[in-house]
Amino acid sequence: MKAFTRLTGLVCPLDRANVDTDAIIPKQFLKSIQRSGFGPNLFDEWRYLDHGEPGMDNSIRPQNPDFVLNFPRYQGAQILLARENFGCGSSREHAPWALDDYGFRVVIAPSFADIFFNNCYKNGLLPIVLPAEVMDRLFAGCEASEGYRLTVDLAAQTVTTPQGDSFGFDITEHRKHCLLNGLDEIGLTLRHAGEIKAFEDNRRQTQPWLFR
């Protein structure tokens, strides 16, 4: 998993509430268990004018010129602004995979669906909860200024605007440690590989019948 420490990135505003996981990555793209390759189909039904299916050449599909991800000013965005209850709907880990594969490292919203929120941390995507009034200020700043960038400092737990306004956010120490060090659940387990092996070797000696 990629580590996250500090990022100054271009911001894209998705001014919609209750964006569900089927909107983030539609169900027809869930057949793959690879974590990569979902970026071109992020927000597929809003991003394109036709119906998308796996294997299509997205470079020749007609794009929706009114969808924010297709605006030239937001190309290369790494921080997504969203509204309340982002990531609601069915549980699918493909949703954070698609956001990450597109290039987003941070999603900032007033609230998230619980399962999506947890899945973000497991896949190196930082979900940040800020009050609705702060989100209104960030949306206004982003829409008023082309090339609007925010600085997200995980160690300091702050989001800072180009004007120098800084907003703190909460994160558990465990999740913070994992993101700062690029550790997912497998990575955390592998850090104790020696201890696990020693435990298993001891069990083979003391409880050999378990291994017959």
Curated annotation (Swiss-Prot):
Signal peptide: none
GO cellular component: 3-isopropylmalate dehydratase complex
UniProt keyword Amino-acid biosynthesis, yes or no: yes
Stored InterPro entries: 3-IsopropMal_deHydase_ssu, Aconitase/3IPM_dehydase_swvl, AconitaseA/IPMdHydase_ssu_swvl, IPMI_Swivel, LeuD
Keywords: Amino-acid biosynthesis, Branched-chain amino acid biosynthesis, Leucine biosynthesis, Lyase
Entry superkingdom: Bacteria
GO annotation (BP), single: L-leucine biosynthetic process
Pathway: Amino-acid biosynthesis; L-leucine biosynthesis; L-leucine from 3-methyl-2-oxobutanoate: step 2/4
Assembly and oligomerization: Heterodimer of LeuC and LeuD.
UniProt family annotation: Belongs to the LeuD family. LeuD type 1 subfamily.
Official protein name in the record: 3-isopropylmalate dehydratase small subunit
Organism, as annotated: Laribacter hongkongensis (strain HLHK9)
Designated gene of the protein: leuD
